[in-house]
């Protein structure tokens, strides 16, 4: 039997990397599975900081599961096929550990699925470590903590579940870090956008959603200065338009999130700007608008877009 590949979504963030590495380890220890954590893209700057801090080598990047000789895969931090490996429909999905909506997903065989409405996939994996009585190595605890911090913006996002607030201090202790100090340093490491090209910037953390027959690209970047990002608006818009044309996106929505003040600016281009405006009850001026209190794509952007596009 070939090795089972474990991976998060395309354009992996800290939770995609952390949950996949942690679950691959747990699957070996608890279930005796022959697993390998891989990635569907190179780590972003935040995740690179995490891996370096805990001395963990980045998972190797793959573009095809079958090309690796894999017959089975385990998905973490995602389930929608368009967010997964290119040939996901050609391999068996052995299992899924996720905290997102379930959409565009079907399998030919029964599978293991663990879905919980918590702040991160890493939160679920940590609970599974405890359920199976498997000791958590320091570096694995650090990766799971980082995934939780990243997805909940240090427990400030509305996606934060009461369970996450219990888990975070436990993981911080296991990882040997101060939760607040490490969390802030980690989040700030991911806000260095000046060195990124516009094409790189809009692809740092981007996912495609099928909304009533439209392929809508929703990306998010974290910053400490929204105005600084908007100084590059023309360049960013050109990259968004090119992405729409080359990938068949009907619309591109970019969240520029201020992690200090917990607000976002929405920059949007495409064929359905009326639906984008209706989703958030705002008016786009020069293609962008302020969205007070919005920091979560999963809870404060995608559901609203889904409702508007389906109206």
From Swiss-Prot:
It is found in: Cytoplasm. The keyword Hydrolase applies. Pfam families: DHH, DHHA2. Its EC number is 3.6.1.1. Binds 2 manganese ions per subunit. Mn(2+) 1 binds at residues 9, 13, 77. Keywords: Cytoplasm, Hydrolase, Manganese, Metal-binding, Phosphoprotein. GO terms for molecular function: inorganic diphosphate phosphatase activity; manganese ion binding. Phosphorylated on Thr residue(s). This phosphorylation is StkP-dependent in vivo, however, PpaC is not phosphorylated by StkP in vitro. It has been hypothesized that StkP-dependent phosphorylation of PpaC in vitro may require specific reaction conditions or the presence of other interaction partners. The keyword Manganese applies. Its main location: cytoplasm. It is an enzyme of class 3 (hydrolase). It catalyses: diphosphate + H2O = 2 phosphate + H(+). Its cofactor is Mn(2+). NCBIfam families: PRK05427.1. Belongs to the PPase class C family. HAMAP family: PPase_C. PANTHER family: BIFUNCTIONAL OLIGORIBONUCLEASE AND PAP PHOSPHATASE NRNA. This is Probable manganese-dependent inorganic pyrophosphatase. The lineage of its organism: Bacteria, Bacillati, Bacillota, Bacilli, Lactobacillales. The gene is ppaC.
């Amino acid at each position: 039997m070939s090795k089972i590949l474990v991976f998060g979504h395309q354009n992996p963030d800290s939770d995609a990397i952390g949950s996949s590495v942690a679950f691959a380890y747990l699957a070996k220890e608890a279930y005796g599975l022959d697993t390998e954590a891989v990635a569907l893209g190179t780590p972003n700057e935040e995740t690179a900081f995490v891996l370096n801090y805990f001395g963990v080598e980045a998972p190797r990047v793959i573009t095809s599961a079958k090309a690796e000789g894999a017959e089975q895969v385990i998905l973490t931090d995602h389930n929608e096929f368009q967010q997964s490996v290119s040939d996901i429909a050609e391999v068996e999905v052995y299992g899924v550990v996720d905290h997102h909506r379930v959409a565009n997903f079907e399998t030919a065989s029964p599978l293991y699925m663990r879905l919980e409405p918590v702040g991160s996939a890493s939160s679920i994996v940590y609970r599974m470590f405890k359920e199976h009585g498997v000791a958590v190595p320091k570096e694995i605890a650090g990766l799971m903590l980082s995934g939780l911090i990243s997805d909940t913006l240090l427990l400030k996002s509305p996606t934060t579940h009461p369970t996450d607030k219990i888990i975070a201090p436990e993981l911080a202790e296991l990882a040997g870090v101060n939760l607040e100090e490490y969390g802030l340093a980690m989040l700030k490491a991911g806000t260095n956008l000046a060195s990124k090209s516009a094409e790189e910037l809009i692809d740092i953390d981007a996912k495609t959603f099928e909304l009533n027959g439209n392929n809508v690209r929703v990306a998010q970047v974290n910053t400490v200065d929204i105005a600084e990002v908007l100084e590059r608006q023309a360049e960013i818009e050109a990259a968004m338009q090119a992405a729409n044309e080359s990938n068949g996106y009907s619309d591109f929505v970019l969240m520029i999130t201020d992690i200090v003040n917990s607000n976002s600016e929405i920059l949007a281009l495409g064929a359905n700007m009326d639906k984008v405006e209706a989703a958030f009850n705002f008016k786009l001026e020069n293609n962008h608008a302020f969205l007070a209190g919005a920091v979560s794509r999963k809870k404060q952007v995608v559901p609203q877009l889904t409702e508007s596009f389906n109206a």
